[in-house]
C-alpha cells in the first residue's frame, strides 16, 4: 500500500516482475539472457560473468527505460561495461579466463569463489593473500574457505605492509590444512600468478583475489607499482 501512489518497476529472474530475464546463459567469460525492453524481446550480453551480473543488468535496464534510453544503446552499454577490480576479466593472448576481484574478506572471498564455481566447466584456481597490519584472525578462515571451494589454491602475498609475508601465508595455510583442498604456497605474488597460468586451461578460471583495482603493492611500509592487469599481460609477453 505504501507504494500505490508511486510508479514502481520490479525486476527479477525467478519471480514474476515487470522486467524479467529469461533463457539465461552463464559462461566463465560472460552472461547473456533475453529480456523485454519496450515492446520486444532483446538478447543482452554482459562481459561480467555470474548470476549476480544478470540482476545488476536488470536494475540498469529498468533505470535506462525510465530515462527513455533506446534498447540499442542499452544493449551496447551493457556489452561494454566493466567495473575495475570487480569480477574483472583480463583480456589476454592466451585466452585464459583470468578474473581480478577485490575480495579481501572471508565473506567476499566465499561469494566470488561460489559464484565462479557455479558456472566454470573446468577448475577454479584461487590466488590470494591477506593484508598485513590488519585483522589476522581472518587469515585461517580465508584459507579454509578457499580450500573448501576452489579446486586449487595458491597462497601468496597481498599487501604485507610491515609484517613478514611468510608469517601471513603460514597463518592462511593453517586454515587450508583443515580442508582436503589442493594448494601450494608461493610468497611472491607475480610468481604465484605465473604458477596459476601454467596450470590453467581455457576451461578453467583463475581468480586473482584481494588486490582488485589497486595500482600498488605495499611491502615493508613502502608502496611499489603493481597493477594486476599489467602484470598478467607482461607475464604472457
Residue ranges and their predicted role:
Residues 15, 25-27, 81:
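A short catalytic or substrate-binding loop motif that flags glycine-/basic-rich loops and adjacent residues
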Residues 18:
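A residue-level signal for beta-strand positions that form part of recognition/binding surfaces
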Residues 2-7, 29, 38-39, 49, ...:
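ATP-dependent carboxylate-amine ligase
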Residues 24-43:
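Acidic-glycine-rich active-site phosphate/pyrophosphate-binding loop
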Residues 43-51:
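A short glycine-threonine-serine/GTX helix/turn-capping micro-motif
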Residues 9-14:
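Short beta-strand elements of ligand-binding domains
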Amino acid at each position: 500500500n505504501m507504494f500505490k501512489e508511486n510508479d514502481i518497476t520490479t525486476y527479477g529472474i525467478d519471480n514474476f516482475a515487470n522486467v524479467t530475464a529469461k533463457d539465461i546463459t552463464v559462461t566463465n567469460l560472460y552472461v547473456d539472457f533475453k529480456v523485454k525492453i519496450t515492446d520486444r524481446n532483446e538478447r543482452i550480453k554482459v562481459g561480467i560473468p555470474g548470476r549476480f551480473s544478470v540482476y545488476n543488468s536488470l536494475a540498469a535496464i529498468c533505470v535506462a527505460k525510465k530515462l527513455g534510453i533506446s534498447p540499442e544503446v542499452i544493449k551496447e552499454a551493457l556489452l561494454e561495461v566493466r567495473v575495475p577490480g570487480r569480477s574483472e576479466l583480463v583480456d589476454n593472448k592466451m585466452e585464459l579466463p583470468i578474473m581480478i576481484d577485490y575480495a579481501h574478506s572471508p565473506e567476499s572471498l566465499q561469494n566470488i569463489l561460489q559464484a565462479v564455481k557455479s558456472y566454470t566447466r573446468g577448475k577454479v584456481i584461487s590466488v590470494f593473500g591477506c593484508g598485513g597490519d590488519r585483522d589476522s584472525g581472518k587469515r585461517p578462515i580465508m584459507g579454509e574457505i578457499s580450500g573448501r571451494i576452489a579446486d586449487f589454491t595458491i597462497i601468496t602475498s597481498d599487501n604485507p605492509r610491515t609484517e613478514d609475508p611468510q608469517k601471513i601465508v603460514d597463518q592462511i595455510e593453517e586454515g587450508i590444512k583443515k580442508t582436503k583442498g589442493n594448494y601450494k604456497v608461493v610468497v611472491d605474488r607475480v610468481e604465484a600468478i605465473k604458477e596459476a597460468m601454467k596450470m590453467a586451461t581455457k576451461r578453467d578460471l583463475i581468480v586473482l583475489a584481494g588486490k582488485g583495482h589497486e595500482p600498488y603493492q605495499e611491502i615493508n611500509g613502502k608502496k611499489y607499482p603493481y597493477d594486476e592487469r599489467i602484470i598478467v599481460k607482461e607475464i604472457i609477453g
